[in-house]
């Protein structure tokens, strides 16, 4: 069997909100689908009916759309339980699925015994040696079987789009559980059945799934499906090379929406793991030209928050100003003042949410500012010399020259006390533009009170 056209998928479980690692996987799958000229499918893996919630599924959809990801098809696993059961019956009939009556305690003892003997902790297939009478005795005790897939004792090889040639010896792998004793299907079978039924041609996921892939390849074949191509990418780590902090590994993408621009976050996530520098982009489509799955290395990409903040700040300067103005209105900033305000402060933002702080600084004098007596006296002298002309670049430069001549100050000792006196901060927009925005009279009052 072959695939008529490329189809990729992202398959989140709606047992929680979308986090940064999964968002990256979704982005890369969506981009690869476009690069190959195929379609992208969202599959909601909600077979865990106790923990899955529509609230989470809806939030995942919203987060993907916020990132600019679109999909041409959506499927839901909870609507397909009969299909999974049919696949299990097919495997039973072919002798590739078998019933196991081992309890969790017995399996744990089996694992510890194998490790103690220096053997790999794989299932010993003792269930295959049970007699009919022994099975009947277990069921009389009330034991319900779980079902395993019997692997062929052969080599499992594939050429991974990201890792190159991959080899597993099936005799060193445990026969995977397909169905729990309570009758619930597990990811191993549901994912393969869906990928096979829907003709998913390429599967891109984290390297923690590599061993799953080895067993699933045999399952694809046992069910008569074509085997997709695979790409397994290293998992993200923190800037220090250690596992991501709880904030980034478990917090939802939605929590980041107020701080980061979707284009900046998308460009940053896509560039991670390659030698390419992340740059501000207009949309995800902009990334297609340079996107190449072969460009991703085998080392774990480092998620550097400072680098993301820097890129986000640049995105704010290059992004859609109309969209930013609408968001400024949501912060209570009048429409008629939005353009001038944005022109002055956008270059000093790392996150959009900081715009609200600058609006407050411009319109409300800081409560108390700790300054030396010398700087306080200097600011008062500056207030005495300020004129309406200071709101222009030329007038501001003349004011600085006059202050320099009058006080003997120069460099940082000249302009830093003024910035501090006006804003309470050591950094920010150019002072002439800032004064023009807050008004010369307000600037004079702030400097004169120090």
List the predicted regions and their residue ranges.
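N-terminal Rossmann-like or analogous alpha/beta NTP/dinucleotide-binding catalytic cores
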Residues: 1-117, 212-225
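Short amphipathic alpha-helical segments and their helix-coil junctions
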Residues: 4-9, 285-291, 328-331, 388-409
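A short glycine/serine-rich beta->alpha loop
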Residues: 12-18, 203, 402-408
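Residue-level signal for inorganic ion chemistry
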Residues: 29, 60, 91, 95, ...
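Active-site cores that bind ATP or allylic diphosphates and position pyrophosphate for catalysis
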Residues: 99, 103-232, 237-244
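Catalytic adenosine-cofactor/nucleotide-binding cores of aminoacyl-tRNA synthetases and other
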Residues: 225-368, 423-450
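Long, amphipathic alpha-helical coiled-coil segments characteristic
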Residues: 366-395, 399
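Charged substrate- and nucleic-acid-binding regions of tRNA-handling and nucleotidyl-transfer enzymes
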Residues: 390, 394-450
């Amino acid at each position: 069997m072959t695939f008529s056209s490329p189809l990729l998928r992202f398959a989140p479980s709606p047992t929680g909100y979308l986090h940064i690692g999964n968002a990256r996987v979704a982005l890369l799958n969506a981009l690869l689908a476009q690069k190959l000229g195929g379609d992208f499918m969202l599959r909601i893996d909600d077979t865990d009916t106790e923990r899955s919630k529509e609230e989470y599924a809806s939030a995942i959809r919203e987060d993907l759309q916020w990132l600019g990801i679109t999909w041409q098809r959506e499927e839901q696993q909870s609507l397909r339980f009969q299909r999974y059961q049919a696949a299990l019956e097919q495997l039973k009939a072919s002798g590739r699925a078998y019933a196991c009556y081992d309890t969790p305690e017995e399996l744990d003892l089996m694992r510890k015994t194998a490790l103690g003997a220096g053997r790999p902790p794989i299932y010993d297939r003792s269930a295959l040696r049970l007699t009919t009478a022994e099975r009947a005795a277990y069921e009389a005790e009330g034991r319900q079987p779980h079902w395993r897939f019997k692997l062929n004792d052969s080599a499992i090889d594939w050429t991974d789009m990201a890792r190159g040639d991959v080899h597993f010896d099936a005799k060193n792998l445990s026969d995977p559980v397909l169905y729990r004793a309570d009758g619930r299907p597990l990811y191993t079978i549901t994912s393969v059945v869906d990928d096979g039924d829907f003709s998913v041609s390429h599967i891109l996921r984290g390297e923690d799934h590599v061993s799953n892939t080895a067993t699933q390849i045999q399952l694809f074949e046992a069910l008569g499906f074509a085997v997709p191509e695979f790409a397994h990418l290293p998992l993200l780590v923190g800037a220090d090379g250690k596992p991501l902090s709880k904030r980034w590994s478990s917090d939802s993408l939605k929590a980041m929406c107020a701080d980061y621009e979707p284009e900046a976050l998308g460009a940053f996530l896509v560039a991670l793991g390659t030698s390419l520098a992340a740059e501000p982009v207009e949309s995800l489509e902009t990334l297609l030209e340079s996107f190449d799955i072969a460009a991703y290395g085998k080392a774990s990409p480092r998620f550097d928050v400072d680098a993301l903040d820097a890129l986000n700040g640049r995105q704010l300067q290059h992004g859609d100003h109309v969209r930013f103005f609408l968001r400024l209105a949501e912060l209570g900033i009048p429409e008629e003042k939005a353009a001038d305000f944005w022109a002055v402060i956008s270059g000093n933002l790392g996150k959009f949410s900081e715009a609200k702080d600058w609006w407050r600084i411009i319109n409300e004098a800081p409560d108390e500012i700790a300054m030396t007596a010398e700087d306080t006296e200097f600011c008062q002298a500056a207030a005495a010399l300020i004129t309406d002309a200071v709101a222009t670049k030329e007038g501001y430069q003349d004011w600085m020259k006059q202050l320099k001549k009058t006080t003997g100050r120069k460099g940082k000792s000249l302009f830093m006390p003024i910035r501090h006196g006006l804003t309470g901060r050591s950094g920010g927009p150019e002072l002439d533009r800032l004064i023009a925005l807050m008004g010369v009279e307000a600037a004079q009052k702030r400097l004169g009170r120090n």
